[in-house]
Amino acid sequence: MAISYQLEQTSSESRARLGKLKTPRGEIQTPVFMPVGTQATVKTMTPEELKNLDAEIILGNTYHLHLRPGNDIVREADGLHKFMNWDRPILTDSGGFQVFSLGKLRQISEQGVEFRSHIDGSKLFMTPEKSIEIQEDLGSDIMMVFDECPPYPAEYDYVKESMDRTIRWSKRCLQHQKHPEKQALFGIVQGGMYPELRKESALKTTELDFPGYAVGGLSVGEPKEMMLEVLNTTIPYLPEEKPRYLMGVGTPDYIIEAVRMGIDMFDCVYPTRVARNGTAMTRFGNLTVRNAVFQRDFQPIEEDCDCYVCQNYSRAYLRHLIKANEILGFRLLTWHNLFFLIKLIKELRQAIADDNFLAWRDSFYKNYQN
């Protein structure tokens, strides 16, 4: 078995839980946030800096790395870890979400998806088998099944057909996997915003006995209340002894609520993307540093933050860098945002360990506005 999960503690007042995910490249404390390294880099950060921020695992993107530089080149480099000089665990997504969100003029069949590259318009065909082959070339520690991610909103019949297809594709991924002892393969629960389809997907996916399970197809434009309601009805059908991963979620309030419901793993481009838009994440909510109000503001992003950025630079300087389109500005805001989110997860874990998660959550929300 490539990974093993150990449930260590469950909150007495919610479904929040602490665990350890053991992989060939190290142990991960859960809950955990995974910074996204789409193109074999977490934008503007070096692997060494990510380690200093205590990032335990990062995410790589199958679709993007297949198109550029090509999974054959990554394989020749002896895998993604060597290629990007990262010796901690890596999770790769299956490329499914990107095929459905970025791929132009896509055509879905039982075999797979035909689409056009968002880079040069060339015609490509992705199948469950192809996705697994690419992820095996990349050499990630955790792979994901190739799934169909339906849009929001979508009609019941379409989502049902899509969900059934994802189950069939999941079986094909399992059958095509060559080295389950080296690389874990997680299943993905779909079903759109329909609780009965989510239940059906969860039950059928868990029958396939994956070492971990993701909840996909959420945070795709639906209202927050709907997303949390669907998540809450899905999680009870996932086994307690396996890790649970909520795909594409990375704001503090969503993470806290999902942890309360029993989610262990998160990934999102949010902290790095908003940094490049000139926004800093804080425990009081987002701070749009590029705004004119910070032109003469010489205090740090957060007074009590002990990250490198807050210890050394002012809001005024960061605003100047962002307005001047200087790379350092985007880099420093990315640094702060990742530090903030990883530290938040550490505090959250400590609150679960102390069995006062709900009190900690209420205290956080008193200040936080988003």
UniProtKB/Swiss-Prot annotation:
This is Queuine tRNA-ribosyltransferase. One of its GO terms (biological process) is tRNA wobble guanine modification. PANTHER family: QUEUINE TRNA-RIBOSYLTRANSFERASE (PTHR46499:SF1). Its cofactor is Zn(2+). Keywords: Glycosyltransferase, Metal-binding, Queuosine biosynthesis, Transferase, tRNA processing, Zinc. The active site is at 93 (proton acceptor), 267 (nucleophile). It catalyses: 7-aminomethyl-7-carbaguanine + guanosine(34) in tRNA = 7-aminomethyl-7-carbaguanosine(34) in tRNA + guanine. Signal peptide: none annotated. Transmembrane segments: none annotated.
